[in-house]
């Protein structure tokens, strides 16, 4: 590493991606193997960022039951009735252990409109319409404008 690639802790943000029940919990419909085993390590990172009052953004997916916002590789499953990260379901929620407060619930209406949902001090959730959290979202501008030189 050099001075241009060395991480700067004082100006860093933490981004969690798809750490939702339907992708993380053992036996979940779209379990990503090995993710559940990493929840404790993720919690340690989140705890450190919370203590340092650094920004945290949880990037999530929400799939509408009609399949209108679903990636092509999952669209047929959703159209055939499979519920994956469906708005307002337990499966769409962030894993409880990683939330700043286990009672917090995602608000899909605002998230689906591109709003960032405040979860705690310096902590938000945001919806991504496709695989890339920067595609058709305001994530990049929010990181630069809201949090300074990250």
Provide a role label for each language-model segment.
Residues 1-13, 43-51:
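Short amphipathic alpha-helices and their capping/turn segments at secondary-structure boundaries
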Residues 3-4, 28-30, 79, 123-125:
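N-terminal start-of-chain detector that recognizes signal peptides
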Residues 17:
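Active-site flanking residues adjacent to catalytic metal/cofactor-binding acidic residues
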Residues 21:
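Short, glycine/acidic-enriched loop or turn micro-motifs at the edges of active sites
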Residues 27-35, 83:
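Short glycine-enriched, charge-decorated loop/helix-capping segments at active-site entrances
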Residues 39-147:
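Active-site alpha/beta core segments
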């Amino acid at each position: 590493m050099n001075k241009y690639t060395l991480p700067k802790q004082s100006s860093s943000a933490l981004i969690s991606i798809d750490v939702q029940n339907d992708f993380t919990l053992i036996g979940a419909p779209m379990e990503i193997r090995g993710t559940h085993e990493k929840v404790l390590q993720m919690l340690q990172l989140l705890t450190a960022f919370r203590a340092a009052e650094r920004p945290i953004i949880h990037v999530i997916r929400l799939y509408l039951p009609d399949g209108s916002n679903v990636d092509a590789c999952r669209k047929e499953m959703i159209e055939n009735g499979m519920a994956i990260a469906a708005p307002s379901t337990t499966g769409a929620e962030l894993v409880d252990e990683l939330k700043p407060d286990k009672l917090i619930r995602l608000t899909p209406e605002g998230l689906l409109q591109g709003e960032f949902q405040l979860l705690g001090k310096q902590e938000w959730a945001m919806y991504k319409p496709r695989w890339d959290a920067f595609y058709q979202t305001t994530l990049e501008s929010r990181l630069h404008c809201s949090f300074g030189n990250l």
